[in-house]
């Protein structure tokens, strides 16, 4: 029997929502490291006016407040059973609930933070989102939901890099070798995205209609 493989580390990637290209790539040697280890990297990367779509690995009030202090905004999903206080109701209808809330306990790790809780009804299910953009005129409820749905593009990017381009399997166990394969694979991914975009333009089709696998 072949020996059981070992996890080589953990990578963090920021993807541009429009271009689908990686903005930054980080590697941590500890495969069990928490996502919060990438928070300093993100804080150093983002510029004022940026809107981040965050998964629940970055569900951290102190980090959110640090982003807001840098004039960077976010959209994420609220955790089930999360505690909050309603400060203002913008909309409360059959299909939309949009409220200004306060979360946190006032401690260093969980400071008080003011956010919008946007809830969109789909048949009998409510989908709940948090955003630091507190003005509904700037970011209406349905735009919040639509933008967060596009966060799935990061999952698609990881799937392409790991499965189609082979990053699930490493050539070497050395850290330098792993990093070389990591950067090389993402570089190839960027070329594939750029080429697929050119194919979409040539065929006058939306990018989503183009098969990256067929282009590859």
Annotated model-derived regions:
Residues 2-216:
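Single, function-defining residue in the core of a domain
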């Amino acid at each position: 029997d072949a020996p059981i493989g070992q996890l080589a580390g953990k990578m963090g990637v920021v993807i541009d929502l429009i271009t689908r290209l990686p903005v930054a790539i980080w590697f941590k040697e500890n495969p069990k490291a928490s996502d919060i280890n990438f928070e300093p990297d993100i804080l150093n990367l983002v510029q004022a006016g940026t809107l981040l779509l965050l998964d629940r690995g970055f569900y951290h009030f102190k980090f959110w407040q640090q982003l807001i202090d840098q004039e960077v905004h976010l959209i994420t999903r609220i955790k089930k059973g999360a505690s909050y206080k309603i400060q203002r109701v913008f909309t409360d209808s059959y299909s939309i609930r949009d409220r200004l809330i306060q979360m946190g306990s006032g401690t260093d790790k969980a400071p008080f933070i003011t956010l919008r809780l946007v809830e969109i009804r789909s048949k009998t299910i409510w989908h709940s989102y948090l955003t630091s953009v507190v003005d509904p005129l700037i970011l209406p409820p349905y735009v919040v939901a639509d933008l967060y749905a596009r966060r799935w593009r990061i999952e698609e990017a990881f799937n392409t890099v790991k499965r189609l381009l082979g990053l699930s399997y490493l050539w070497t166990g050395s850290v330098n070798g792993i990093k070389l394969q990591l950067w090389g694979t993402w570089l190839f991914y960027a070329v594939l995205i750029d080429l697929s975009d050119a194919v979409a333009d040539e065929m006058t089709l939306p990018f989503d209609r183009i098969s990256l696998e067929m282009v590859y």
